[in-house]
Swiss-Prot record:
Disulfide bonding pattern of the chain: none
First and last residue of the signal peptide: none
Keyword Cytoplasm in record: yes
GO CC field: cell projection; cytoplasm; cytoskeleton
Organism of origin: Xenopus laevis
Functional summary from the UniProt entry: May control cilium integrity.
Entry superkingdom: Eukaryota
The protein's name: Protein KATNIP homolog
Length: 1414
């Protein structure tokens, strides 16, 4: 019985185990299915994450086909397929049953290689022992697929084997149902090739115009686009094939068969066997077969072995799985393909018709023959192919059509189409390189003033300073000076200089900002170095100019003028390579031809009339200047152009030149004319060899020589001196006289050359009637100017020269020489040089010089002659008188300048031309207008010089705008035009406006457009807002008090200020942006200020220095609208800068010095001298007396019983607020006694929180006296909530006088100091005594190395300024001002040195230092 029960129990146990095993198997299968589903989803997500964008796909295309060691040492050792292998493979491919599997819509693609074993994936059979004791063998599934999708095609291996390559032996086998063949002859091949070239060019051009929305067209094309594929060969096979029949030529009887695949075949994405990220795309190929009826081509090397292209065995055709993302059929992967195909079809139809009309009868050898539309059909098939396949086909067609002439024509046509379609239509940049090879004599430096570029429309091209580079130099200087727009200037900081080590290269990048199609540079202008006459040798001389690495100019540049009145530019035509130097005085006159004819007729000198001057031949000029010359000997006839830097220089006849040089050299001085011929540029240097004791520097008195040559030439040719032929010859003085505010220069050292050139002329006007002189002049020269105009001109000139009428003839001649800064040691030479036209008698000379007889036999001006003999005795006193006159004139000029500076300088709105871009614009406009007028009127209107244009523009500008006196209004608008160089930001430190009462104007509202940089996406809470401009803190570099806004050149930038009430504005002070020396270039430069829409100022604001030192002029500009002394005196009382300057200039009197001197010990008094660094008892007693006398009137001291402190902000901690200690400062500066009963807080401490019941940081720690500590047991801490009140209330027993509060902020550690209080509001008996923004409490240091107490005195926030307050504040101990009532110890020794920083340079909240040295 017992055995039966045991047996039944065992059966039940076995049954339960079997049931459990079945259930576990079911659970395992379910879990396994869930695992497979999850794994499949993960694989799909991984594939989606590996999807590539268009850029990655393009890179993938570029990286395809590369393999390592392609041409290595073992490249030829690979196994070569034999003929048996080829036959075996061809027979195997022919035995494949055509069961229709190949015609399925899509074939299953295996995405993972089967031979690669996954890591940690067990594929071998395993043996598992079950619970019943039996052994179970489990093996992997042989049909496992990685993507776990259903296997719809069980015959994919057989189907994949079907796609094999066919040899040439199969060309006669009937083509399958999915194949399409076209037979072309030679003419068809040529037409197809030409059409395909055009098609590819069009498609390549359309590729550039695709939108960003279609960036994924490559992926879509590879997956969905159903295209017929031409079986084109690979690259290496094409090369071998090309070598096979490269020496042959396609004859008219030869045919080419194009075979296309089925239309329903889709592109499959080929994944390589290796696990790579960059997959390759497989394109099945077939060879292009050439049929020929003649046996010649069959016996050639183009055999079946050469034409067979075996598929690489390492690559297997593995297609993507059938399920793909659905893409709309109507969405083409390339939107422009359809339009391009239509255009190509239309064009090809026309080409096909043209070819078919002129084509002879063709021979047909294919199974279906050749029809007239075979080319059209081929093009339709080819258009459906991919671009890469079309390119391969084009290469094959070019190889087949091997005619040399055809190939050359096709290549030329391809280049033509590439230039039309593929090259960019717009040229973006042009690179200009200016290579400086030499200068005008300076051994150390090279310099230029300005370089400008002009386009084909003769408009100036803007060049950014960032696009200028100086190369081949160690110290490049400031390249921005080359493109700063300062052309006519003598200021050195506007010019570019650097150490000269030739060659120096200036590199410019000229950008096509307008994106115009005809962008090019027609010419460029170069202004040479122009600081002063003595520094003109720094200017560049021999230069080479390269345009995009092509030499376009090689020649000389003219020197500068040494002044800012004349245009000294060099215009270089980059197309012709010619240079034209601007003269100082225009030399293009209407009567130039007549002068040249009259001068050339008498001397047989060939004069060529050109647009830029008169031309001599070298042989004739050398004969003129051969006397005394050692170098001017040439035998060839060369054209020598007199190119110089003055506008008065002209070529003269040989007699005039000979006599002028005789006058210059006097007796035996030799003249050398050195010719510098450099590639069409010929410069003539004239140097004077001093035989005795004088030498003339040609670079300095070149202008004077020019004027003298003119005078001598006219005199020696028996003609009276000519009158000016246009406005620019002698009317420069007239211009100066008619210009307001322009005074006549009386300094002989700076005497203008145009005045010196007419000194003799002026003297003659006193010695003979003016009318006769004018008649003689007008009879000689055919001048367009009337006699009446000349009379008027001379009358004005004589009136303007009355200052010099009382001087003798010698002084006039001396001043003429001084204008060119030349120093003569012999006064006889000076006399002869200046008075050459006045004497016809022999001049006595001293020394070894011989007398020179004047060639003039008659010097009569309509019956009036000059005969004056100079006594040699008169020349003895010449130098003393010359020195006295020079000193007197210099003193007069200096005195005049000082008077002008005192009386008129502050009243001129536009003092100088430099720096005003609006004046430059007006000058250019006036130049253009006057040039156009002169062109219309012909030769009757002469072009005006640069000086007259400058003076007239200055006059017009000055007359159009004047600074008003005390303008009245309420709305002030500041328009910012430019900055000091920054192209992105503009900023200011502050704006101050003072009324006519002397007080600052109260501003109700300020706004700006753009408001600040917070409008930019990268900014959001930047403190540099526009309100900071009127916060009163101007001399600072703190961002909390600056204003910064985005700046866009050419756009409008405004700052608008609204006054509380209308007033008369007396002064506006603008504090420019002063963040640092670099950031100071963000400051405003040119501004226009409007008051109630009335312009009250237009000009330039000085750039800030970027430092905190210096006077107010170092931080901006002050604009005065009045010179009334009473208003200025009233403004000085409220102007902080004036008080600071006054303090800096104050010097203590002797009594003050004695009272500040510390007392010392003597034998009379027994008291010990006071040596402690503090206040003496005498000063303390005086302070006590003063305090008692003025106790009721002291500002900043408040009386009350209930003091309330409200803390509203911490230094960053959002949860806790704390203090270390606190004291209430009384009247005498001592702390008031506070008991714990009088002290209360809300919240009390941390005990209100459940977890801080027994916390020691309670309220009584504030008054325990332990303040300099890091222990939080002596600190007070409470919970903090932003926006809530956190108060401390102190109730005194009686009314107390309170002067301030002393705080020790929370100081547990540097990290915990952010819990310290930051803002506190103080009220006494309900009355607020703190400013509207509260008191700012300094953050604790986090250590206890020093006393970090902060004393807040109410008196510091009182704005009343009275003398009594200043005295009390100066003696107050709390201010801790320096005093001399102590003796400094000698070499103090200690561990801790304490520096008490009393004040900052304007910042009320922060103070700092850069460093300390001891």
């Amino acid at each position: 019985m017992h055995g039966k029960s045991l047996g039944s129990s065992r059966k039940n146990d076995s049954r339960s185990k079997i049931r459990q095993e079945k259930e576990s198997n079911i659970d395992f299968d379910e879990k396994h299915d869930e695992y497979l589903i999850n794994l499949q989803q993960r694989n799909r997500a991984l594939n989606n994450s590996k999807a590539k964008d268009a850029t990655q796909i393009k890179l993938q295309h570029l990286e395809e086909g590369f393999s390592l060691y392609l041409n290595g040492a073992n490249a030829d050792l690979r196994k070569q397929q034999s003929t048996q292998d080829l036959a075996r493979e061809s027979s195997k491919s022919s035995k494949i049953p055509d069961d229709g599997c190949s015609h399925l819509p899509g074939r299953r693609s295996q995405t993972a290689p089967g031979k690669i074993q996954r890591k940690a994936w067990v594929q071998n059979s395993i043996q598992i022992k079950s619970e019943r004791g039996s052994r179970v063998y489990i093996g992997p599934n042989t049909k496992y697929s990685e993507d776990f999708e259903s296997d719809d095609d069980m015959n994919e291996d057989q189907a994949s084997d079907q796609y094999k390559y066919f040899t040439d032996s199969e060309k006669n086998v009937p083509q399958g149902p999915g194949k399409k063949r076209l037979v072309l002859d030679a003419s068809d091949v040529k037409a197809l090739r030409e059409s395909l070239e055009i098609s590819l060019c069009l498609q390549q051009d359309s590729k550039y115009s695709l939108d960003d929305d279609d960036a994924d067209f490559v992926e879509e094309e590879l997956i969905e686009c159903e295209t017929p594929e031409l079986d084109s060969p690979s690259k290496t096979q094409l090369e071998s094939k090309h070598q096979a029949f490269g020496h042959q030529r396609l004859l008219p009887g030869d045919f080419v068969v194009l075979e296309f695949n089925a239309l329903d075949k889709k592109d499959g994405r080929m994944l390589t066997a290796k696990r790579k990220d960059n997959s390759e795309f497989y394109i099945p190929t077939k060879p292009v077969m050439v049929k020929n009826k003649t046996p010649r081509l069959k016996s050639s090397s183009f055999s079946s072995k050469d034409s067979f292209f075996p598929r690489p065995e390492s690559r297997q055709e593995i297609l993507l799985p059938t399920p793909r993302r659905s893409i709309s059929e109507n969405k083409d992967s390339r939107p422009s393909v359809s339009t391009v195909v239509d255009a190509i079809n239309n064009e090809n139809e026309a080409i096909t018709r043209a070819i078919s009309d002129g084509k002879t009868e063709k021979m047909t050898s294919g199974p279906s023959g050749i029809s007239e539309g075979v080319v059209t059909k081929a093009i339709e098939k080819i258009n459906l192919m991919k671009i890469s396949q079309q390119k391969k086909l084009l290469k094959v067609l070019q190889d087949i059509d091997n005619d040399s002439s055809t190939n050359s024509n096709s290549e030329g046509e391809i280049l033509k189409w590439d230039s039309v379609y593929l090259d960019p239509a717009v040229k973006d940049v042009i690179c200009i390189t200016v290579e400086i090879l030499s200068n005008w004599g300076n051994q150390y430096y090279i310099g230029l003033t300005e370089i400008q570029f002009f386009d084909l429309k003769n408009e100036e091209i803007y060049v950014s300073p960032h696009d200028v580079d100086i190369r081949n130099v160690d110290v490049p200087g400031d390249p921005t000076c080359l493109v700063n727009g300062k052309t006519l200037t003598t200021k050195e900081h506007f010019m570019w200089t650097c150490p000269f080590h030739p060659p120096v290269q200036l590199y410019f990048i000229i950008r096509n900002a307008t994106k115009s199609g005809d962008f090019d540079i027609s010419k460029m202008k170069i202004w040479n170095y122009n600081k002063a006459l003595s520094d003109l040798d720094i200017g560049a001389k021999l230069v080479k100019i390269y345009k995009d690495e092509t030499l376009v100019f090689d020649g000389l540049l003219a020197k500068g003028s040494g002044n800012q009145d004349f245009d000294y530019s060099n215009t270089i035509d980059l197309h012709s390579g010619q240079i034209k130097s601007s003269s100082f005085i225009s030399d293009q006159f209407s009567d130039e031809t007549q002068i040249s004819n009259s001068l050339g007729a008498s001397n047989n000198i060939e004069l060529k009339h050109q647009s830029d001057g008169l031309v001599y031949t070298s042989e004739q000029l050398s004969s003129i200047l051969s006397e005394g010359s050692n170098q001017a000997k040439t035998s060839q006839q060369k054209d020598l152009h007199f190119e110089n830097n003055t506008k008065g220089l002209r070529t003269f006849q040989d007699e005039a030149l000979n006599k002028s040089f005789q006058h210059l050299a006097l007796t035996s001085s030799s003249i050398n004319c050195q010719e510098d011929i450099t590639e069409g540029e010929v410069g003539i240097k004239m140097s004077y060899n001093k035989e005795e004791h004088f030498k003339i520097n040609q670079s300095k008195d070149f202008n004077t020589m020019t004027a003298e040559l003119q005078m001598v030439s006219a005199t020696s040719s028996k003609e009276p001196p000519p009158c000016p032929r246009d406005d620019n010859d002698l009317t420069v003085t007239d211009q100066l006289e008619r210009t307001p505010g322009r005074k006549e220069c009386s300094s002989l050292n700076r005497f203008p050359p145009w005045l010196s050139s007419s000194s003799n002329f002026q003297q003659k006007s006193h010695n003979q009637p003016t009318k006769n002189h004018l008649n003689a002049s007008s009879s000689t020269f055919t001048n367009k100017r009337s006699d009446q105009d000349i009379n008027q001109f001379l009358d004005e000139y004589v009136k303007s020269s009355n200052t010099y009428s009382n001087k003798n003839f010698k002084n006039c001649s001396q001043s003429k020489m001084l204008c060119s800064s030349s120093k003569m040691d012999n006064e006889d030479d000076l006399e002869n040089f200046s008075n050459q036209s006045s004497y016809n008698s022999d001049r006595p000379v001293s020394g070894r010089r011989k007398t020179v007889q004047m060639q003039d036999k008659s010097e009569k001006y309509e019956g009036a002659s000059f005969h004056k003999t100079i006594n040699p005795v008169d020349t003895k006193n010449l130098r003393p008188r010359w020195q006295n006159d020079q000193e007197n004139n210099l003193l007069e000029s200096w005195t005049s300048l000082i008077k002008f500076n005192k009386s008129h300088r502050g009243r001129i709105s536009n003092l100088e031309f430099e720096g005003d871009i609006f004046d430059e614009f007006l000058q250019q406009q006036q130049k253009a207008g006057k040039q156009s007028d002169s062109t219309k009127n012909g030769s009757s209107l002469m072009p005006k010089g640069a000086t007259e244009i400058h003076l007239e523009s200055e006059k017009e500008e000055g007359s159009n705008f004047e600074i008003p006196v005390l303008p009245y209004g309420q709305h002030l608008c500041i328009k910012i035009v430019t900055t000091w160089g920054d192209r992105h930001y503009v900023g200011l430190n502050g704006i101050e406006v003072f009324a006519s009462t002397g007080k600052p104007v109260e501003i109700s509202r300020i706004r700006a457009d753009p408001p600040d940089i917070n409008i930019l996406p990268a900014y959001g809470k930047d403190p540099r807002v526009v309100v900071n401009l009127i916060d009163g803190v101007n001399r600072t570099q703190d961002d909390m008090h600056l204003w910064l806004a985005p700046f866009s050149p050419g756009k409008l930038h405004f700052i608008n200020l609204d006054f509380v009430e209308p007033c008369r504005v007396a002064m506006i002070r603008i504090w420019n942006y002063n963040k640092s020396r670099i950031h100071s270039f963000r400051g405003v430069k040119e501004v226009e200020i409007f008051l109630d829409n009335e312009l009250i100022f237009k000009g330039e604001i000085a750039k800030a220095s970027g430092t905190l030192s210096g006077a107010a002029e170092q931080f901006g500009d002050t604009i005065l609208f009045t010179t009334d002394d009473e208003i200025l005196q009233a403004m000085s009382l409220f102007d902080e800068t004036f008080s600071e300057e006054l303090k800096a200039t104050e010097t203590p009197t002797e009594h003050e010095i004695d009272s500040l001197r510390p007392s010392t010990a003597d034998s009379i008094k027994e008291e010990r001298p006071f040596t402690q660094a503090g206040l003496s008892e005498k000063l303390q007693s005086n302070l006590t007396d003063v305090s008692e006398n003025y106790s009721d009137k002291l500002p900043g001291i408040y009386s009350g019983k209930c003091l309330l402190l409200n803390f509203t902000m911490t230094w960053g901690d959002p949860h806790y607020l704390g203090l270390t200690g606190m004291e209430i400062v009384g009247r005498d500066g001592k702390a008031l006694a506070i008991t714990l009963d009088a002290l209360s807080a809300c919240p009390q401490d941390l005990s209100i929180l459940p977890e801080y019941k027994d916390d020691l940081r309670t309220l009584d720690k504030l008054i325990d006296g332990v303040n300099i500590t890091n222990e939080d047991t002596h600190m007070w801490l409470i919970p903090f909530a932003s926006g809530a009140d956190h108060t401390i209330t102190i109730n005194f027993n009686k009314s107390e006088d309170i002067a301030g509060i002393r705080f020790w902020n929370y100081n547990k550690s540097p990290e915990d100091t952010y819990r310290g209080a930051k803002i506190v509001y103080v009220t006494l008996d309900g009355h607020a005594i703190s400013p509207p923004g509260g008191f700012l409490i300094r953050k604790g240091p986090g250590n206890c190395h020093f006393d970090f107490a902060q004393e807040i005195l109410f008196v510091d926030y009182i704005h009343e300024q009275q003398i009594l307050e200043k005295q009390l504040r100066s003696h107050s101990k709390c201010m801790e001002l320096a005093t001399m009532d102590y003796e400094a110890p000698l070499m103090p020794c200690g561990f801790i040195f304490q520096l008490q920083l009393i004040t900052s340079w304007g910042d009320p909240y922060y103070i700092g230092l850069n460093g300390l040295e001891m």
